[in-house]
Amino acid sequence: MALMLSRIPRRFFFLFLTVGLIAGAFLYSLIYFVDVDLVSKVNQLYDQQIAPMLSDAIGTPSVNHSFELAPLDSHLVATSTTFHEASYESEPQQNPASQNIVLLLVSDGHTSYNNGANTFEEAIQNRVDYSTKQNYNFEYVNVTGLPIPAVWSKMPAVLQTMKKYPKAEWIWLLDQDAIITNTHLSLQDSFLKPENLQKTLITNTILTKRPINANGDLRYTPSNYSLKDIENLMVIISQDHNGLNAGSILFRNSPATALFLDIWTDPVVAECAKANNEQDMLGYLISKHSQLASLVGLIPQRKINAFHEGPENMEWQKGDLVIHFAGCWVENRCDELWQKFYALID
């Protein structure tokens, strides 16, 4: 081939090259402007053929098998402290087993706008008490030294915790500015048992306010969930009036979740998404990628993320598991609200 090309006069070579480039540009324009359904056809091919193969490759998660995560980048490894280790002496009475749940606090010792320093020890104690009562593991990851903002450090901290607890099934990431108010209520009894989760998941509801296309269409949760669908969920989260709220969120410990988290923290993707925080980034990912959206389950806010004020479906009521003081800094009421509800812990 090289010999044949060398025999072609230079002027003809450049002529052929120019014609080829023009033809390529014309073909690209034809596809782009005439076959407007091409993108949808490719997406359909992905959903029907490629995605199932990816699903088969990832497999369904199981607490009976642990997996090895790739090492984190060294600059994203933070100090991790186990404040409570679950007991494995007794037979599991719940599904998932209590000892396979990790309660995780990721913090630099502060909450939004430098609040929370004087309530940090109480936040730790609250989680120790709850984990002890429910036989969960409780892990604290101190992200003070990480070279990224605290809200972006959550995802590598979850990955780090997944690596530390390879046999754990679920990791519950709960922000520092939240109090577990009902320590008698387990996650399993509240919603995490597969049969309970099937009843609790919100259906036919907008999953994110970010449009999925130029027409402004939105992505919705499924109309129903089978138990098989439940097994494939990797993230459980709730919404507030602004959209998805990552102040209280659960991650299934699986290779699919690890990949999800790795993409979630990608700075290049975050720049493309124009995401100001981890919640914006999550909204972008599930609006643009149907396969990632299928991994996310939406549950009522008061199940894991009740607020101190708001409409009935949002505002904390006695017996609720958690209260989250999101936005308390706006009126400088964080310490006041903390002390008020800390006294109501049951």
Swiss-Prot record:
Disulfide bonds: none annotated. It comes from the Eukaryota. Residues 33-346 are lumenal. Pfam families: Glyco_transf_34. It is a single-pass type II membrane protein. Gene3D superfamilies: Spore Coat Polysaccharide Biosynthesis Protein SpsA, Chain A (3.90.550.10). One of its GO terms (cellular component) is Golgi membrane. Its main location: Golgi. Glycans are attached at N64, N142, N224. InterPro entries: Glyco_trans_34 (IPR008630), Nucleotide-diphossugar_trans (IPR029044). Its EC number is 2.4.1.-. The keyword Zinc-finger does not apply. Keywords: Glycoprotein, Glycosyltransferase, Golgi apparatus, Membrane, Signal-anchor, Transferase, Transmembrane, Transmembrane helix. PANTHER family: ALPHA-1,2-GALACTOSYLTRANSFERASE GMH3-RELATED, ALPHA-1,6-MANNOSYLTRANSFERASE MNN11-RELATED. One of its GO terms (biological process) is protein N-linked glycosylation. It is an enzyme of class 2 (transferase). GO terms for molecular function: alpha-1,2-galactosyltransferase activity. Belongs to the glycosyltransferase 34 family. This is Probable alpha-1,2-galactosyltransferase gmh2. The lineage of its organism: Eukaryota, Fungi, Dikarya, Ascomycota, Taphrinomycotina. Residues 1-11 are cytoplasmic. It is found in: Golgi apparatus membrane. The chain crosses the membrane at residues 12-32.
